[in-house]
């Protein structure tokens, strides 16, 4: 194992010594400045469908919440937790709808039969 490792190291050293050293190429200069400059910190812009920009004031920070107080919108609550009675009524409605669909299918099957 030592002989294989020594041979490999010698081969790499020989290959490295035989290649002339070339300095790395310099990075190309950018043709144009990249990106857009950021707007000043206290100014926010609201974007609309029109191409114009309108400045919008920032909300004041709430002292108790830090920067989280700047967000004044409430999180919408679409559906509350249903009560046990509401869950039972829902399951009854689903069961009745499935039963009616099954009976409708059976009725159509009987009517389609030829005697």
From Swiss-Prot:
Keywords: Secreted, Signal. Residues 1-17 form the signal peptide. PROSITE patterns: VM. It is found in: Secreted. Its main location: secreted. One of its GO terms (molecular function) is structural constituent of vitelline membrane. InterPro entries: Vitelline_membr_Cys-rich-dom. Residues 35-72 form the VM domain. The keyword Signal applies. Pfam families: Vitelline_membr. The keyword NAD does not apply. GO terms for biological process: vitelline membrane formation involved in chorion-containing eggshell formation. GO terms for cellular component: egg chorion; extracellular space; vitelline envelope. Belongs to the vitelline membrane family. Major early eggshell protein. This is Vitelline membrane protein Vm32E.
């Amino acid at each position: 194992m030592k002989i294989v490792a020594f041979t490999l190291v010698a081969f790499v050293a020989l290959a490295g010594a035989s290649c002339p050293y070339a300095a790395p190429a310099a990075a190309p200069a950018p043709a144009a400045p990249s990106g857009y400059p950021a707007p000043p910190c206290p100014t926010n812009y609201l974007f609309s469908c029109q191409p114009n920009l309108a400045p919008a004031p920032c909300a004041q920070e709430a002292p108790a919440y830090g920067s989280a107080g700047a967000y004044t919108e409430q999180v919408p609550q679409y559906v509350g937790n249903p009560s046990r009675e509401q869950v039972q009524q829902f399951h009854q409605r689903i069961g009745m709808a499935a039963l009616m669909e099954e009976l409708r299918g059976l009725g159509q099957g009987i009517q389609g039969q030829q005697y």
